[in-house]
Amino acid sequence: MLLPKRVKYRRQHRPKTTGRSKGGNFVTFGEYGLQAITTSWITSRQIESARIAMTRYMKRGGKVWIKIFPHTPYTKKPLEVRMGAGKGAVEGWIAVVKPGRILFEVAGVSEEVAREALRLASHKLPVKTKFVKREELGGESNES
């Protein structure tokens, strides 16, 4: 599972979940990607579960890039504990995903295989997603 090697502070405030994603909105490494449409927290366990679902479907073919990382700790107090007495212990790690963010990228397989693998991965995640293809940036060509 994904988690940071070391952090400056053990516990953090809950992150903002408003607005659209500032970066990571385009397919850069692979040919196909899975893009978030809604906002949510994604835990390291959900990311790992989605990765396993994709790689099992694709068997030995293709390459998968995970474009999100769970940097933020989330805490939880034990059951039946009264309020106060400090912040709870770190329960796990989350990645805040906003609309437009590319979650996973795939290359080296056909579009049908990539579409199905990413569909299986999307069922493991708490966000609505869509399948996107890499867009070649159209610029001026130097051919004359």
Swiss-Prot record:
Keyword terms, alphabetized: Ribonucleoprotein, Ribosomal protein, RNA-binding, rRNA-binding, tRNA-binding
Pfam family, one: Ribosomal_L16
Originating organism: Staphylococcus carnosus (strain TM300)
Family: Belongs to the universal ribosomal protein uL16 family.
Compositional bias annotation for Basic residues: 1-19
Gene3D superfamilies per the UniProt record, alphabetical: Ribosomal protein L10e/L16
Subunit: Part of the 50S ribosomal subunit.
Superkingdom of the organism of origin: Bacteria
Keyword S-adenosyl-L-methionine tagged: no
Annotated protein name in UniProt: Large ribosomal subunit protein uL16
Annotated GO biological process: translation
SUPFAM superfamilies named among the record's database cross-references: Ribosomal protein L16p/L10e
Any one GO MF annotation of this record: structural constituent of ribosome
Lineage: Bacteria, Bacillati, Bacillota, Bacilli, Bacillales
Stated role: Binds 23S rRNA and is also seen to make contacts with the A and possibly P site tRNAs.
Region (Disordered): 1-23
GO cellular component, one term: cytosolic large ribosomal subunit
InterPro entries: Ribosomal_uL16, Ribosomal_uL16_bact-type, Ribosomal_uL16_CS, Ribosomal_uL16_dom, Ribosomal_uL16_sf
